[in-house]
């Protein structure tokens, strides 16, 4: 059978932005990792990811402190959620303060990180509810095996221009990986973030529902209840 995954090669994001018309921005994300975040004698666990700076603008994170444009420009920087900042710093402005990240997840990077931003907590219905983000390049430097085209361990996020056609871009992507990897049989394609939660299930490479089935079930129940009420 055919398996479908969000794991892609590390170099893909930059290549797509440079080579595929209609893609105006791109960024890389690691998989979610849980770390022990330490400030003095205070330590809390928090799930986060390593991300390119462009992710901050594409995800439209709302910053309370710091600037989304530059918050992840430095190697040992970290942006944290409002709730994490509250637990560690109370009502104080944490910008410029140093946190220790104690690596508990495989391939994560421990050490001292400077707080460069605080963002509003993400809604409960987000696919990712990360509590911290640090630069992808920091993760990549510590794990150089991420760099080759034949390692699929990075999530690639792209932003299209308003006039771009996803269908047209997907046609260009059909055999794109074979131009980068000799003998590659894998294919990549765009999948809208709007569909991640409700239509994120694939069978043999073809979309096959997801949580949308529960929406349909609830809709059917609602219709039945309404029909019964009308009798």
Regions found by a protein language model. Name each.
Residues 6, 49, 78, 216-219:
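Residues that recognize and position ribonucleotide moieties
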Residues 14, 34-35, 97, 156, ...:
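Residue-level detector of beta-strand structural context in well-folded domains
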Residues 210-231:
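Hydrophobic alpha-helical transmembrane segments of multi-pass inner-membrane transport and secretion
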Residues 52-65, 77-210:
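Mid-to-C-terminal secondary-structure elements
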Residues 37-40, 75-80:
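Short secondary-structure transition/capping segments
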